[in-house]
Amino acid sequence: IKSRQQKMRGFYSNRRIYIDNKVTCEEMNQVKFYYDTDWNVVSPSDDEGNSIYVYLTAGQDHKITMEAIPGEIGDSMRRLNSIVSDINEYYRRILMITGPAPDKFTDYNVDRSIPELVDDFSEISKELKDIKDNIESLSGEKGSEAAGIERMYVILDKCIEKPSKIPKYLKQIKDNVSAISSWMRDYKDQPLEVDYIEIASSDREFTSTDEKFIKSAAFSAKAFLTSFFQDYSMISEETDDDVLDVWINLGRDQALAIKELVESDFTPEYNIPVNLNIVQGGVVEAALAGKGPDVALFLGGEFPVNLAARGLTEDLYQFEGIEDVLSNCQKNAHVMYEYNGGLYGLPLQQSFPVMFYRKDILSEIGCTDIPETWKGLIDTLPALQRNYMGAGLVLPTSNISPSTEAGHTFALLMLQSGLNYYNYDMTSTTFFIFKAVQAFETWTDFYSKYKFEQTYDAFSRFRDGTYPIVIQDYTFYNKLKAAAPEINGLWDFTMVPGTVRDDGTVSHAANSSGTGAVIFNKVKNKDDAWQFIKWFSSTEIQIGYGNLIEGLLGTMGRYDPANVQALKQLSWSPSEMDKILGQWNELKEIPVMPASYVVTRNIMTAFRTAVNKHENPRDTIMWLNRDINAEITRKRENLGLD
């Protein structure tokens, strides 16, 4: 097996090898692939180094399967997982006493407040030393992973020696726990690259990985010279006159997955040649210069509407079957791609907010009921803040962030009140309505009265427990699963806090963000372009694309399709899917207009003025609303809409 394992320095990955679904001998139960930055040929062998022979019946197909297994270190991993959980619990308990920024001149007496702390740290330190010795004996060398464990017990020993200094070491404890957890995640993945698998008869030797010097040098020189002329943004190169030029506004991994699907499914079935290019940004400029594509995939934000306002894209309502395609999506998913009665983008991705919460921490501080409404969230704050904790909301980081960003608190409050940003004919805002002013005041109160932070790292705060409640995009789940294994099972998610309606029911309405596919009006064959985006947005292809991306990138790269039937077929558990669909059914959308930029700027200006300068929220939003409506009117006249 020509392979390379260059992720876990000082250790090895393990594989169990099956021949026709059977492990043929004990040596195949665990084949080790040691750390090396170079490629090596690994051949399963016995204790004396003799090759393993397998009988294969001639004339038949045979299957080789490689299964990732933990190997001998599995017991150490289980012990480490328990230790990480214990240290995290003590970290939170200490944090409740000292707060996130301990005063170095204050003696917090944490060892008295937590009497068992020093004894337990001593036991944990001993166990970490034992685990480190075990790992080094298995690997045969001192790797970075064992060094990380060593750093952890050195810190614990300092805490044991001088308990009064424990608050000083809080950050180091947190950082080392994160480092150990990260390595545990990598080990669980059992990283391994495989170039090829070679089967040889007993009278032959396996191919060496060493290449002849001249051949290697020639290849390197050729690759170097080619790098000056190669267009790395081009994924495929078709030269037919009727080729469909498609730009992809994503990374190379995603583009290669689309290329695989196009070559294996679309082109053979429809006989339409396709050129794929990676282009991140510059689409509007290229289209205005007449150098744009025929089709662009994964355009998001205000781009589809801005392109439509400039007359650069095709109205998708003209194509046969558009209603059937849209029926696969949430009923309002297309709203953000509509302009002046037309549809200028086909939804591909759709993400929306949910509320994540730490079950362990909320239970520990006596919050047994998960907040269902905004009032419930506010009622939870005293218990959180008494313990130096808080909750996190979605707030754009600058005035140029989309005002309709998924989970934007003002947008949630407006939608849950039965309002939208704009009136029916999109000629002015609704911010002058009493309920809209109430929504704005509620939003600013979170930051002025209840002292929510305007900027924070949601992942770090949720991971270390200082923010046991955060509202984030549902794809935040992927990051927690992949990058915070030490808190697996300690958290969950549910719908965003809601607003009680007049009839007593609760509205959990929220907006979403997404990306779509657009067809440019320079396209030679509109029907071919429509066939392509209809094919790509179909349930079968969206499932295939989602599986390819998750296979390449892992859980962190799990796809968020707008096609709900495709979403249901991805790797979500039934309970997780029920929660996602629960929020999905509550989604409402805020339209995009060419003057959305002025809405964005003035909403955030009003917020900063009311919160940071302590101005009256009502007066602030009413005053700036006049500027918003004046710019909307000017823009509509400029575009000939009025």
Tell me what each language-model feature is:
Residues 382, 425-455, 496:
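Glycine-centered hinge/linker elements that transmit conformational signals in sensory
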Residues 217-240, 301-354, 378-380, 406, ...:
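Hinge/lid segment of periplasmic solute-binding proteins
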Residues 484-555, 588, 605:
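Extracytoplasmic/periplasmic substrate-recognition and gating elements
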